[in-house]
């Protein structure tokens, strides 16, 4: 699917888009998802990462899958400058930050989403590795991040914030993020505020995310869940409000 194809589908009269599930919660199958829920998912991620209108987003994943579609939807929801390149194992090859699709992006790409293999390949080429440090927020999904790749990412210089995602097609991309590098690096996934998590008797993760999925989802991932204290900061009319709240987070222990 091309970008033009997806935008045509997005802008048609239907309130739904066709996607195909990944098989995380059962046998892969086609499903129709509501555009408003995709916008909800986009808004949640953009708010979490602090993305704002005029920031840039790199589309380097196939639009045949939910991850690529959601990059476009985030750019629509938050009025981001979309940088579209052909899906490949080297997404940053031949990118000039002074002239991206005819626009100077001030020396950085604000947001990018990649699969682990794209990240690994990028790190093997010095020029591409250098460009990666000019990405402000990188989310990695669609596969496991092995220990050696995670260690290499933690050693990257610059101000890049790198996140591992947890989610599936049914949740319209991710419902939780885990910081890989920096002072906030952790092995625990932090669900978004609108997401509730629990476990089955077998220890499998149960997801209740009504803004993005109408049904409660039972996954095949065996997890450990713990509570932690979180200092929530909200800013209204230039006045900051601090609130200490108790939240749940999880880490993956295995598969059923």
Residue locations for each model-derived region?
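Conserved ATP-binding/catalytic segment of the ANL
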Residues: 206-256
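Conserved pre-ATP/AMP-binding loop-to-beta segment of ANL
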Residues: 3-20
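Conserved S/T- and glycine-rich ATP-binding loop of Class I adenylate-forming
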Residues: 21-24, 57, 72, 112, ...
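AMP-binding/adenylate-forming
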Residues: 35-40, 56-121
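Gly/Ser/Thr-rich phosphate-binding loop
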Residues: 125-183
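Conserved AMP-binding A3 loop
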Residues: 16-43, 50-52
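Glycine-rich helix-loop-beta junction characteristic of Rossmann-like nucleotide cofactor-binding loops
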Residues: 47-51, 129-130
